[in-house]
């Protein structure tokens, strides 16, 4: 018996087993995709378990209930008022990404390749106009050590505005050639669409977040015990719920014959295009979150009596647009991400009278969702090391300052302020953020 137990422990601690355990998310995702392929009626929208409610509402609500339990109310409200970060993410999510994808689709359309379906290109444009995803970017931002409070606020704001912005962008991109054939029925179902989106965002994001905040403030000891229990036993509720959300999306897509309605060449094209465009958008989001020229234009804080009034006002307005690393990670996850939970509703509502093309329209969105989660999961470890590197550097600088009794006051202030402070208060360190 002892020999068998030691053998099991040896196998469990083997390097191959450790690697498989580290990739548990993708292994579970692959299993769920296979189940969705052969039993799509189980978790699809309108299926056996009514996935649009049990998963579309229940799983997303649990994620934000968890977020509400672990976030301080004062910090949450401060992040809600961070208009600079919200403006940056909204411009990236709606305007920049959709315009770039539209340009690529025009180029592909001009190539006139018969293997690339015309309605798949419309699906790409629709995917690019969707708001940021509801669940995955919150989970990835939290795991990477980014500003999850800002991410939660952005999910609420972005999806609320997406109900109005997405249909308007679709009309703008499809009201003339070369994509006039894909223009949805103008005005049909838009009012109902707004109602559904408001209901879903309210019930799955706002209400559980509010309930979590109430529980946290009324029962702080019980909340701390619950969160400590999850942390002690490595229970990752957010990741489990995200797997179920993707399971429901794939079930809906397979049930509507989304992957069999287009050619294999088109599917391969979408896989590589989605991967490349997501990585490109992540890099673009980094450039928007930490533009190098701001440090060149504003190398130091305004000096009383020496700096001009123009420099002082310009510094206060533009310098906070160079975000901290925590906020930058949130921007890099929220900017390129596109929601499938609300995206399916946005697409089906606009193309309700074109059911024969609905499967083709959903293919780019479903594939983009799984690829963005896989790629973002890879970025988590990179971003975490990026933050930890500065945390270690700040710690070494602080210890050196304590040993030296005659330390420059300016240096002490810069260390005390810290890189990791959010830009919400607009108290920007004198030293340049790393």
From Swiss-Prot:
Solute carrier protein that negatively regulates the cytosolic calcium homeostasis in response to high levels of extracellular calcium. This is Solute carrier RCH1. It holds the Pfam family SBF_like. The chain crosses the membrane at residues 16-36, 51-71, 88-108, 119-139, 150-170, 200-220, 235-255, 265-285, 328-348, 363-383. Keywords: Calcium, Calcium transport, Cell membrane, Ion transport, Membrane, Phosphoprotein, Transmembrane, Transmembrane helix, Transport. GO terms for biological process: calcium ion transport; negative regulation of cytosolic calcium ion concentration. It is found in: Cell membrane; Bud neck. Induction: Expression is positively regulated by calcium/calcineurin signaling through the sole CDRE element (5'-TTAGCCTC-3') in its promoter. It comes from Saccharomyces cerevisiae (strain ATCC 204508 / S288c).
């Amino acid at each position: 018996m002892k020999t068998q137990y030691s053998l099991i422990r040896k196998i469990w601690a083997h390097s191959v087993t450790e690697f498989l355990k580290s990739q548990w998310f993708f292994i579970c995702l692959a299993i769920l995709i296979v189940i969705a392929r052969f039993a799509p009626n189980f978790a699809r929208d309108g299926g056996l378990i009514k996935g649009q409610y049990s998963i579309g509402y229940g799983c997303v609500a649990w994620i934000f209930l968890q977020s509400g339990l672990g976030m301080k109310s004062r910090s949450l409200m401060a992040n809600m008022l961070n208009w600079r970060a919200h403006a940056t993410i909204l411009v990236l999510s709606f305007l920049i990404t959709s315009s770039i994808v539209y340009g690529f689709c025009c180029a592909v359309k001009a190539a006139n390749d018969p293997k690339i379906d015309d309605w798949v290109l419309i699906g790409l444009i629709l995917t690019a106009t969707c708001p940021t995803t509801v669940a995955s970017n919150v989970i990835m931002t939290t795991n990477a050590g980014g500003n999850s409070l800002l991410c939660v606020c952005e999910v609420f704001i972005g999806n609320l505005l997406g109900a109005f912005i997405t249909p308007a962008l679709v009309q703008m991109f499809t009201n003339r050639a070369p994509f006039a054939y894909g223009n949805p029925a103008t005005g049909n179902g838009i009012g109902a669409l707004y109602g559904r989106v408001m209901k879903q965002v309210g019930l799955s994001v706002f209400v559980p977040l509010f309930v979590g905040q109430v529980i946290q403030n009324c029962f702080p000891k019980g909340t701390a015990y619950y969160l400590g229990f999850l942390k002690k036993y490595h229970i990752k509720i957010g990741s489990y719920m995200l797997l179920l959300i993707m399971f429901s999306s794939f079930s809906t897509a397979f049930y509507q014959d989304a992957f069999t309605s287009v050619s294999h060449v088109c599917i391969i094209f979408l896989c590589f295009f989605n991967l490349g465009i997501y990585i490109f958008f992540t890099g673009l989001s980094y450039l928007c979150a930490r533009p190098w020229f701001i440090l060149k234009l504003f190398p130091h804080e305004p000096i009383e009596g020496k700096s001009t009034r123009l420099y002082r006002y310009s510094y206060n307005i533009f310098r906070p647009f160079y975000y901290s690393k925590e906020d930058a990670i949130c921007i890099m996850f929220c900017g390129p991400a596109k929601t499938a939970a609300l995206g399916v509703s946005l697409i089906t509502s606009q193309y309700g009278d074109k059911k024969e093309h609905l499967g083709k329209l959903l293919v780019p969105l479903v594939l983009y969702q799984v690829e963005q989660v896989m790629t973002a999961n890879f970025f988590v470890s990179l971003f975490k090391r990026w933050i930890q590197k500065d945390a270690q550097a700040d710690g070494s600088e602080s210890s050196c300052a304590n040993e030296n009794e005659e330390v420059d006051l300016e240096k002490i202030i810069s260390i005390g302020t810290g890189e990791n402070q959010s830009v919400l208060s607009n108290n920007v360190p004198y030293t340049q953020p790393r």
